[in-house]
Amino acid sequence: MEQREIILLGLAALAVTYQVIVWIYNAWFHPLSGYPGPKLFGASYLPGLYHRIRGDYVLVHTALHERFGEVIRVSPNELSYINPQAWKDITGQGSGRQDMEKDPLSFGRPMPNAPSIFNAHRMDHSRIRRTMSHAFSASALRRQESLIQSHVKMMIQCLREHNEEVVDMVSWYNFTTFDMFGDLAFGESFGCLTNSLYHPWVKMLIMSMKAGYFIIQAQKYPIFEKVLMSFIPRMMRQRRRDHLALTQAKLAKRMAKPEERPDFLSFILRHQDEATGMSLPELEINASTLIVAGSETTATLLSGCTYYLLRNPRVMEKLLNEVRTTFKSEDEIDITTVNGLKYMLAVLDEALRVYPPAPGNFHRLVPKEGSVICEKFVPGETQVSVCHYAAYHSPCNFHQPDEFIPERFLGESKFENDRRDVLQPFGTGSRACLGRNLAYFEMRLILTHVLWNFDLELMPQSKYWANQKVFAIWDKPELYVKLKPRAGLEVRA
């Protein structure tokens, strides 16, 4: 054997030995080694990466929590929680502590000179949130109602053209919410409802979201980054770049319009402070963020809610009765009246629990000095999070956790021990979602209009629709539903 081959074999053996030592250290001697969880996950990052690429990590985490308890170690430097106290300890809510910073490896690195509200550091986040909050105030929502209503009514008009036909409700909810948020963010609709198909920009956006997920997974593990990036189709990466370029063009077009209209930009610019306001690059990246956060998540929740209603006829019948007895005509459905639909709100809360639009973990970093989470000290620089889906489906938190029962939010005695404070689909603390009130209004308004006008029937091919993979968000298939005009309903032209 030549000397060169001997050296190469020696180096290979050394590398393998080093890796084995690292795995042994991580599994049995690491500061987190005392936490429960499978030793394989604690030893290496590979099992977690494998399940994230497969899209089944949420179900894996749920099963691990059921086996090991309310806090588990899911990678060498990561802890996952399902106890409601973890929300308070991690976000600083009610504890007098600052919230923990978001992990840049999980949320993506902020673009140079253009942080988004999603991944900005604390100081930038406070400044951006303060400026953007005016677009989501109660007064702004009242002014935006007519714009929102116009898109919902167009959706209903389009669906009426498909009476007695089978439609994909995922697409129709997406058409509606993307058109709505295009109008709110850029001053013009994407035209999805008008054309009854996805605008190329919207298709590009959906593709770029998935690309972003895989890019973040690749960046987490530098040693595998080149290999992982090679699995991301070049077209998908290009679509992500094209999305940012089109966002810039659309925002520039809106800013050139002099008219006053109740969209996000008008409220933001009206309260823009020269010293602490948002720069043009920040406006561009955050307009893009709003489209993603507002449209896709709302459409996802509505799709899931529709599916679970159709799989639970008792709940559907009760909700139909509330909607159809509360209003004498469709014209009465507005921002004020939908707030009185108590069972509707319980249904939406239950849908958010059973099928949260963002079901996974959103990692924070424990400060360098360490911190106490759920009464136990956690070393600094540890990744920590609450896994939404696992927490919401845990028998530790909810009675009959896998059943769709809205009455758990209406005070029924058998659910009195439910730990409802674990349900935080919009987040909590200083980084909670700004658009919570807008989202609830949109969801109530859209679902109320749909149920007022139509009887729905789930098609056999969508019976197991909820069996989905997760790539940050649900990878949703079509939801095939047959539309039937509501019996006895007179439709005015």
Curated annotation (Swiss-Prot):
Q: Does the keyword NAD apply?
A: no
Q: Which CDD domains match?
A: CYP60B-like (cd11058)
Q: What is its EC number?
A: 1.-.-.-
Which enzyme type, at the first EC level? oxidoreductase
Catalysed conversion reaction? asperterpenoid A + reduced [NADPH--hemoprotein reductase] + O2 = asperterpenoid C + oxidized [NADPH--hemoprotein reductase] + H2O + H(+)
The UniProt Biotechnology section states that this protein is used in the following way, namely: Asperterpenoids A and B, but not the final product asperterpenoid C, exhibit potent inhibitory activity against Mycobacterium tuberculosis protein tyrosine phosphatase B with IC(50) values of 3 to 6 uM.
User: Which family does this protein fall into?
Assistant: Belongs to the cytochrome P450 family.
Q: What is this protein called?
A: Cytochrome P450 monooxygenase astA
At the highest ranks, the source species' classification is: Eukaryota, Fungi, Dikarya, Ascomycota, Pezizomycotina
